[in-house]
UniProtKB/Swiss-Prot annotation:
SUPFAM superfamilies registered for this protein in UniProt: P-loop containing nucleoside triphosphate hydrolases, TrmE connector domain
Function: Exhibits a very high intrinsic GTPase hydrolysis rate. Involved in the addition of a carboxymethylaminomethyl (cmnm) group at the wobble position (U34) of certain tRNAs, forming tRNA-cmnm(5)s(2)U34.
Name this polypeptide is given: tRNA modification GTPase MnmE
Domain (TrmE-type G): residue spans on this chain: 216-377
UniProt xrefs under InterPro entries: G_TrmE, GTP-bd, GTP-bd_TrmE_N, GTPase_MnmE, MnmE_dom2, MnmE_helical, P-loop_NTPase, Small_GTP-bd
EC number: 3.6.-.-
Cofactor note: Binds 1 potassium ion per subunit.
GO molecular function (one): metal ion binding
Cofactor: K(+)
Length: 454
């Protein structure tokens, strides 16, 4: 579809409400105003007017706002009609506007896409709009606002600017090799490069926090039947989310709960007890359990403390450990401490975390919550922080890798040309975050995930 078309969409959620808003953006916005309102409202002033049908009858009455480009959200002429929020009324008004020449329904995210294409905001800021709408906690919402206001973009621009200056210095050393001073070996370039690498690592740390706020942590509770997995889910969720009985195999499917630990979203997944299945339904549940385990950020390996004294996962259940991905973090949860009399607490055993608790009484649950938060490196104090997406983390990781490779070329061989190329690639990766260097395919995937009307 053409980006020169005039687009229209409902900007408020579907359904009934006190107010319903239609947004129009494009060169024909003023013509829509004349057709529906009978005049062009004074720019940036609220005007209370009737909204007219083609035969002159009144469809609704409400507030009209006109923002001529480039001083608008999209950078184009924008008209907003704020009427009553009944779906029938809004549908009639939408049909009236679409009947005008040159108008079409906006694609999901197309208003934000046009704002990006018209340099009203960069790609990270555009993504922050969707993140603000989807925020699941106050902390996530505040961080999304910071991103929308350019906090994340400013950090990226600082890195790009530093790389630009460094590239200029390196290129000068390459272009003027006969100068008396060997710029590549005098220590200045390495010092500047080390500074950029340190700054990038700080941004990566903050971005990981922002990603946790947005994406959350996926924790899977796994173990044998009747180990107390569902009781642990209920204890973490603070409600009776799962049925708990003494009958082994009560949980036959995957159960999901979404909670927050001091602002960090946590996706808890309770799974069917792992054993040889007795029937087809249980077999399917166990296979789903393994699928969830393989995609987890951390596994809580639930152990009935009354059945074994072992604390090493391989000693408790070697077959289970053999099937787990080698890099998947595990916390062994020895349950039923209220029965065994074990001392509550968290320890490290041969590289694995071990916690003793009672899911039934709730003793030790706060220790587990703190452990989960700390295991992901999450800090509650993110004042001035920003949200980050997985693609942002990947771009930052790629940039860091190129800088490391460039540093190796510098200190081992004083290879200026190779260093310059690594700096260019690092700069390119960072520019993908703000959209200064992005493929059309990437932009399409990002904006298609937005709401219609945004």
């Amino acid at each position: 579809m053409s980006t020169t078309d005039t687009i229209v969409a409902q900007a408020t959620p579907p359904g009934r409400g006190g107010v319903g808003i239609l947004r129009v953006s494009g060169r024909a916005a003023s013509e829509v105003a004349h057709a529906v309102l009978g005049k062009l409202p004074k720019p940036r002033y609220a005007d209370y007017l009737p909204f007219k049908d083609v035969d002159g009858s009144t469809l609704d009455q409400g507030i009209a706002l006109y923002f001529p480009g480039p001083n608008s959200f999209t950078g184009e002429d924008v008209l907003e009609l704020q009427g009553h929020g009944g779906p029938v009324i809004l549908d009639l008004l939408l049909k009236r506007i679409l009947a005008l020449p040159g108008l079409r329904i906006a694609r999901p995210g197309e208003f934000s896409e046009r704002a990006f294409l018209n340099d009203k905001l960069d790609l990270a800021q555009a993504e922050a709009i969707a993140d603000l709408i989807d925020a699941s906690s106050e902390q996530a919402a505040r961080s999304a606002v910071n991103s929308l206001q350019g906090a994340f973009s400013a950090r990226i621009h600082q890195l790009v600017e530093a790389l630009t200056h460094l590239r200029i210095y390196v290129e000068a050393a390459i272009d003027f090799p006969d100068e008396e001073i060997d710029f590549l070996s005098d220590g200045k370039i390495e010092g500047q490069l080390n500074g950029v690498m340190a700054d990038l690592e700080q941004v990566r740390t903050e971005a990981r926090q922002g990603s946790l706020l947005r994406e959350g942590m996926k924790v899977v509770i796994a173990g044998r039947p009747n180990a107390g997995k569902s009781s642990l889910l209920n204890a973490l969720a603070g409600r009776e989310a799962a049925i708990v009985t003494d009958i082994a195999g009560t949980t036959r499917d995957v159960l999901r709960e979404h909670i927050h630990i001091n602002g960090m979203p946590l996706h808890i997944i309770d799974t069917a007890g792992l054993r040889e299945a007795n029937d087809e339904v249980e077999r399917i549940g166990i296979e789903r359990a393994w699928n969830e385990i393989e995609q987890a950020d951390r596994v809580l390996f639930m152990v009935d403390g009354t059945t074994t004294d072992a604390t090493e996962p391989a000693a408790i259940w070697p077959e289970f450990m053999a099937r787990l991905p080698a890099t998947l973090p595990i916390t062994v949860v020895r349950n039923k401490a209220d029965i065994t009399g074990e001392t509550l607490g968290l320890t490290e055993v041969n590289g694995h975390s071990l916690i003793r608790l009672s899911a039934r009484t709730g003793e030790g649950i706060d220790l587990l919550r703190d452990h989960l938060k700390q295991s992901m490196g999450f800090t509650s104090n993110t004042e001035g922080g920003f949200l980050a997406r997985r693609r942002h983390l990947q771009a930052l990781e790629t940039a860091a890798r190129h800088l490391i490779q460039g540093h190796e070329q510098l200190v081992s061989a004083y290879a200026g040309e190779l260093l310059a190329e690594e700096l260019r690639l690092a700069q390119q990766s960072l520019s993908e975050i703000t959209g200064e260097f992005s493929s059309d395919d990437l932009l399409g995937r990002i904006f298609s995930s937005f709401c219609i009307g945004k």
